[in-house]
């Protein structure tokens, strides 16, 4: 974090960080409504927290669940029948944050849960306007607005479980709810049938950020190594941005496929992972999807210990992890042991 940004956050905290007007943890004994802040959440964040909404409704179907999110990630929450209210905010638009917060304020939520590590000034302003009865934060002991704080480090699924425990909500099942689209599910099954795919390996060569993207030379090296080690069929997971590039690479090989649609969505990726025998991925969102679907994995993670603690594969299936220092292209494909590819 640069010095100017840190200074802005410090000033914002000094101005905005006030204790909530009603600071009464006793109301957590029987909460009737919970609000989750997910405006910065990505696909992996949703998957990791997906069980929470289900378990709240199992505990008490009458508890109201609200989610604050953006238009970009709303499609994930809109398909979850356990969520009662979705409130949209325009990212980085402080006026829209104020407008939305004033609207939600009328609901007087019993509990607001915000697990984010870095609290931006617009987020802090939103929290203050909400005027909820209780605020549960993660590592927010130095914030006045949070009257309840989770201090224990762990996987973010554990952070959410801790928030539920502090809300006196018990859970019985922490398995992820992986969403699906029935029409796309049929499309992918047809693709698998048409290409006679059996025990195929799904590979995601692109993560979030330039340090987690394989370059073309390394992609070709990995594909060559995997095909030479085992003659498995391979399916490369693409997005609209990577479709043409990966399709061109795939034509250099036999039995390497890209789903033939330049407008693929996360639901195509989910179904390909659901049907694969093994996932190889540098992208944490697909790692979390594979965890939820109980697929074996080979994953690439940086040596950032805090990031790994929060976002490691939370899987009961076989999972092999390769760590890189600065850039995933440091890793030789030969670090994938041949026996890991026995499927």
Place the predicted regions along the sequence by residue.
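Catalytic machinery of carbohydrate-active enzymes
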Residues: 1-343
């Amino acid at each position: 974090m640069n010095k100017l940004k840190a200074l802005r956050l410090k000033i914002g905290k000094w101005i905005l960080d006030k204790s909530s007007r009603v600071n009464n943890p006793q109301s957590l004994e029987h909460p009737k409504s919970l609000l989750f802040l997910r405006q910065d959440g990505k696909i992996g964040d949703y998957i990791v927290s997906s069980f929470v909404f289900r378990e709240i409704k199992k505990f008490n179907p009458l508890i109201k669940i609200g989610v604050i999110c953006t238009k970009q990630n709303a499609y994930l929450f809109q398909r979850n029948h356990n969520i009662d209210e979705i409130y949209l905010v325009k990212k980085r638009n402080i006026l829209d944050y104020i407008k939305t917060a004033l609207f939600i304020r009328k609901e007087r939520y019993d509990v607001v849960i915000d697990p984010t590590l870095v609290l931006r000034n617009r987020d802090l302003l939103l929290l203050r306007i909400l005027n909820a009865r209780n605020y549960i934060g993660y590592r927010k002991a130095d914030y006045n607005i949070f009257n309840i704080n989770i201090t224990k480090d762990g996987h973010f699924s554990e952070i959410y479980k801790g928030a539920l425990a502090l809300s006196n909500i018990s859970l019985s099942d922490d398995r992820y709810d992986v969403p699906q689209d029935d029409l796309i599910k049929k499309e992918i099954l047809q693709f698998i049938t048409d290409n006679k795919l059996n025990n195929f390996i799904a590979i995601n060569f692109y993560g979030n950020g330039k340090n987690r993207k394989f370059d073309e030379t390394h992609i070709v090296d990995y594909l060559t190594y995997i095909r030479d080690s085992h003659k498995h069929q391979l399916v490369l997971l693409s997005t609209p941005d990577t479709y043409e590039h990966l399709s061109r690479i795939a034509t250099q090989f036999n039995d390497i496929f890209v789903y033939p649609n330049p407008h693929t969505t996360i639901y195509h990726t989910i179904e390909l992972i659901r049907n694969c025998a093994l996932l190889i991925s540098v992208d944490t969102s697909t790692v979390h999807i594979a965890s939820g679907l109980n697929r074996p994995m080979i994953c690439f993670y940086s040596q950032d210990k805090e990031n790994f603690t929060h976002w490691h594969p939370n899987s009961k299936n076989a999972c092999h992890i390769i760590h890189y220092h600065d850039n995933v292209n440091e890793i030789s494909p030969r670090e994938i042991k041949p026996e890991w590819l026995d499927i």
